[in-house]
Every structure is written in structure tokens, then in C-alpha cells.
């Protein structure tokens, strides 16, 4: 997972809860002042659907959860496994009370159901770390309850990385810290899985910004064609990630064949192994597209060139197209001094790994099956009516 040090303000609309007879509920979206995502590779370190709206600030997607009656907005992250939040009297909240007022913080003394387990937690990221102690409390997300949910409470400060609270929903061996497992345990959903859909980065704050995570169900209105279910591939070093095998091309340039790709919603960019990234740069040169360096490590180019940019990925026979429009990050969304005609490239050098973050994930609809160790993907669709299908058995292909 990764987060940025830049701060933006996004105006977000309120969304009313869906009618109960549809079998799903929506958490409201609100105006937030959030930290935007940036290049930071992590250390490798009633049985109905429950739908929580995600809100997009640049490309950092957040979801709201209530812990002991206290509302928290945290960045959703398939690349880590627990939720951690700021304690109300943490050094971070003392340094920047406005952010804690905006995103929320957790005060154990305000909840009669809060319990300090006395067990420490520590998560190392590419920049910084989060640590503290695990607590349990009653959680509510999208109107559904998960009693006794376990999460981390951080009393530290921003010097350890400067990122917002993180809602880890990745591969997890401890069911007590998995929100989807706890929703299943409480009878809110039948299957321990969730589907995710990300909107276009340019739609942040508009009525069309309808990113969502749906626990226990899929939304067939968010993809075109059929879903392809593929097994998760184990990674070395004991780390657990949503890793799958894929091949990739940029235009007519073959980048890689049958290599490991990590799907990580807590990462903004698409990172390619160095050799693959250099081949991509060569492909840009062939298209007469030149990247210019900007502060913060961003690489800019004219947005008018987006129509030339096209990736094709193959996942076990399922072909996914990622366009320049999918990959582009509006330059003036990151830096107000950048002209609106400039886009920042959403692909960068990943060193020895392929790490596919939000600039890839918004081109697909993805389903993460934690029970069966599988991922299902399809090409994303926009503008279709929502159609929620409760999953009690196999994910439909």
C-alpha cells in the first residue's frame, strides 16, 4: 500500500441509503480534506450484499466505518490485512487536529464495548510504519454490523510516514481482524468475499463518482463481458498478497510473459519491473511521447496524447485493456501550478516487482474471494445500471 504527502480538498456528495428490500446498504459520502496517494512501494513487509461507497481523492479511495459509534474514514487497502486508526489523543492528532476532525479518530473511553487486548501491532510500509495496540469493538460498515471486530489503534505521529488511516482488507490468516470474515460470522453475508469498482479519477467529487466495495456480493452493472476467476499465486518470503500470473503488452511491444503481478488498491500507480518499464519508455518514444520531470517525482506529458497509450494484459486467457485515460493523473490535481493540459503518467519503475495499483484497478472490476484464495476480474463498465448478485457458491463466470 502507499499514500502521498500532498493534501487536497475534495467536495463529495451525500448518497442516501438504498432501500432495504434490495438487500444492500450504502454508507454516505462526505466532503473531506485528505492526503492524496503518491509513489510509495510497500516493504514485502440476512445474507445480503453489503455495499459501502468509496470516495476518491485523486486516487486514494476511502471508506467509512463506525467503531463503537465513532465514524472513521480510512483508505481501503488490499495490500495489507488490518484496519488501523489514530487514537484521539495521538501525537498525530495533536499535530494536525483538522485532519483528525475530518477523517475521525478513535477514543476508547467513549465506547462501552471497547476492549484493549494488550497485543501490539506493527506494520512496515515503504516509507514509515504504523504501530500501537489491538482493540476490539463493535463495527458497522454500510449499515451492517460486525461485533467484536479487532483493529489497531495508533498513538504515534506523522513522522513515521505521514499517511492517513489504513483499512487493510487483504489476505488475512486472522479472521478476527478481517472485516469480511466478521461480517460473515455475524450472518450479514454468506461468503467471505468482496467486489470492488473504482471510478475515473476525473470524477472525484461529482455525482458520477460511484466507487464501491460490496461484501458478499458482486455488481454485474460494473463490468462488461464475463468474470474470469484465477487462483492467487503464493509469493516468496511468507508475505500474503493478491498475486496473480499475467502477461503484458504496451501497444505492439511485448513487456512480459507469465510473470507475477500484485493487485494493491492501497497503491496509486502501476509499477513495472525495471526491464519492463524501460521497454515501456521505449514504446513511448516510438509514439513520440516525451515525459517531462516535475517536482515530487512525477512525469508529465500532454493529456492530448492519451489516445495513443494502450496496454493489454492477459490473465489466464482473460484480456484486459488499460488506456491512457485510465492511467492518466490530472497534473493540476497534484500541483495547482501545473497547466490543465498536462497529465502525470500513472506508470513507474517498480524495481524487482510488478505492483498494480489504482491506475490499473480502475480499468477492471475485481472480486476477491478470501475463502477460496481466488481473484475474479473483468473489464470495467461505466454507466450501466447497478445489479447486485448475492454470492452463496461460486463466483459466476
UniProtKB/Swiss-Prot annotation:
Belongs to the peptidase A1 family. The gene is AXP1. It comes from the Eukaryota. Gene3D superfamilies: Acid Proteases (2.40.70.10). It is found in: Secreted. It comes from Yarrowia lipolytica (strain CLIB 122 / E 150) (Yeast). Its EC number is 3.4.23.-. One of its GO terms (cellular component) is fungal-type cell wall. Disulfide bonds join 93-100, 303-343. It holds the Pfam family Asp. InterPro entries: Aspartic_peptidase_A1, Aspartic_peptidase_AS, PEPTIDASE_A1, Peptidase_aspartic_dom_sf, SAP-like. PROSITE patterns: ASP_PROTEASE, PEPTIDASE_A1. Glycans are attached at residues 88, 310, 314. This is Acid extracellular protease.
